[in-house]
Amino acid sequence: MANRANRHAARTEDSDNTINYVQCDGLAVMKMVKHCHEESSNMDLAQGALLGLVVDKCLEITNCFPFPKSGDETMDEEMYQLTVMRRLRRVNVDHLHVGWYQSSDVGNSLSLALLESQYHYQTSIEESVVVVYDTQKSSRGFLCLKAYRLTPQAIQMYKDGDFTPEAFRTLKVGYESLFAEIPIVIKNSPLTNIMMSELNELLPEDKGHNFLDLGTATVLENQMRSLIERVDELYQEAVRYNKYQQVVFKQDTEKHRALAKLAAENAVRTSKGEPTVAEEEVIKQFRPMTAPNRLTATITSGQINTHAQHIAQFCSQSLAKLFITESLQNAKEAKETK
């Protein structure tokens, strides 16, 4: 994904006030939804480019198109994008590249690939965003479309290439401060709103109850399985980090012991009028340990937090569906008895 950004564009510094909100046309939303649902049937990750323009502090997304599948080795992805945007320009359609979109995996989109791709996009195209579409949640009747941008701290950390614990503490970066969510608004034309109102009136009464389905076993099972996997990964990261701390503590203890011994020997040499040995000779024997990369652990922590929130929210929605279904059933029975 990273190579899909315009590598030759001038890199600019990120700013907190670049984009205040994202306005997405209904046509672009429908194209993203259609693409994501088609790819979800094949268990593939749907990704595509967002086209539009920036007006004041608003990023307007007016069109989009899917990326070619990565399995096609004969396809030049950058040339494909340039060709599509060139042809859109010929028919007077917004062709400015303003970001990209992708579907989410079991309701959780935070990953190392997402972070790296958005870093390359945002340092090439300052106003770019990533729009994430949750196919599972949307299929249950809750349209889930979210826009994200990397925070300035995350960009600085990635630019430095330093993912040590000290770097995370210095920049005050955690899983909650890697991405900043940008409010997203869906805009339709007045004619589209009128048509939607008419279609809503034509919808049979029973069809509106499809989203009250209480079959939640599969969704909870997938969420719990993913949560357990992420907890296991975080445990392995914690074990590796604890081993690193133990090795560092042991090395520091040995170094202090060696320095104390050298100080005593130097005192004896000084009393005898002999030259002392520099401490650097002892310090050279203890090479500093390389700190482990904490980026993976941070991302895994964010995934665990997201899964926990989704499970809690899903359970609340299921309880609400239960009470709504009960009320509708009682009203239906009362209507039939009359």
Curated annotation (Swiss-Prot):
Cytoplasm among keywords: yes
MPN domain residues: 22-154
Assembly description: Component of the eukaryotic translation initiation factor 3 (eIF-3) complex. The eIF-3 complex interacts with pix. Interacts with mxt.
Protein name stated in the entry: Eukaryotic translation initiation factor 3 subunit H
PANTHER family xrefs: EUKARYOTIC TRANSLATION INITIATION FACTOR 3 -RELATED (PTHR10410)
Main location: cytoplasm
Localization per record: Cytoplasm
Gene Ontology MF terms in the entry: metallopeptidase activity; translation initiation factor activity
Gene3D superfamilies assigned to the protein according to its UniProt record, in alphabetical order: Cytidine Deaminase, domain 2
GO term, biological process aspect, one: positive regulation of Notch signaling pathway
Protein role: Component of the eukaryotic translation initiation factor 3 (eIF-3) complex, which is involved in protein synthesis of a specialized repertoire of mRNAs and, together with other initiation factors, stimulates binding of mRNA and methionyl-tRNAi to the 40S ribosome. The eIF-3 complex specifically targets and initiates translation of a subset of mRNAs involved in cell proliferation.
Alphabetized UniProt keyword annotations: Cytoplasm, Initiation factor, Protein biosynthesis
Family, as annotated: Belongs to the eIF-3 subunit H family.
Organism of provenance: Drosophila yakuba
GO CC, alphabetical: eukaryotic 43S preinitiation complex; eukaryotic 48S preinitiation complex; eukaryotic translation initiation factor 3 complex
